[in-house]
Amino acid sequence: EEYGEETLNILRTNPTKVAKEIRGITLARAIDIQEKMLENKNIEHLMVQIEAIVGGLGLRKSLPAEIIKRWKSKSLDALKQNPYVLCKLDNVGFLTADRIAMERLKIPLESFNRKVAAIEYVMKENENNGNVWIEANDLVNRSAQLTECDCKQAIVDISKEYLEIDSKRYIANKKAANDERYIAEKLKRMLL
């Protein structure tokens, strides 16, 4: 009421004036309000930028907010650097992330991040069907179908830190393979 329509602008730009002239508001409180307002303004700006990337593709309206919740102020950079990080969100698969990457961010067809995301997608799909291990050629072929490019080298490149390859050329996510072995050992001990 003190400043009328200028209240928000004055709070945003001059918290000292607010603290001096409005009884009951300390300088610390006025600065806190100013910081929150600036933070909200930054989030609004970020939301608009992310909406420009993911909006209009028929995706859920909450996606920009989910992205900001996950990556905070680094959301835009994370999205531009590797749009396939979207696959880490619930109900965002490779095809959705790939559509955003290809249509909006013009990611190259042969992008390493794109190939890795396709490989992870195929492996996750395989796990969701109850299979920890996938035959190497099947992984290569299914990844190639998704990306329309050769993913063999990407599989080799990520295999040391992410994948486990057995002697029969079957491949598994290291964590899933370790979990499977742990469960098998537990069951074996229970049955003996």
Language-model segments: residues:
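Short acidic, hydrophobic short linear motifs in intrinsically disordered regions
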Residues: 65, 129-143
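Short amphipathic alpha-helical interface segments
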Residues: 116-132, 191
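Helix-hairpin-helix
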Residues: 1-3, 14-35, 50-71, 82-103, ...
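Short, basic interhelical loop/turn and adjoining N-cap
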Residues: 5-8, 24-25, 73-77, 144-151
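Short, leucine-enriched amphipathic alpha-helices that occur as contiguous helical runs
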Residues: 4, 47, 112-120, 136, ...
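ASCE P-loop NTPase motor cores of helicases and related translocases
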Residues: 133, 145, 166, 170-192
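Long, charged amphipathic helices and adjacent flexible linkers at domain junctions
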Residues: 38, 43-53, 115, 119, ...
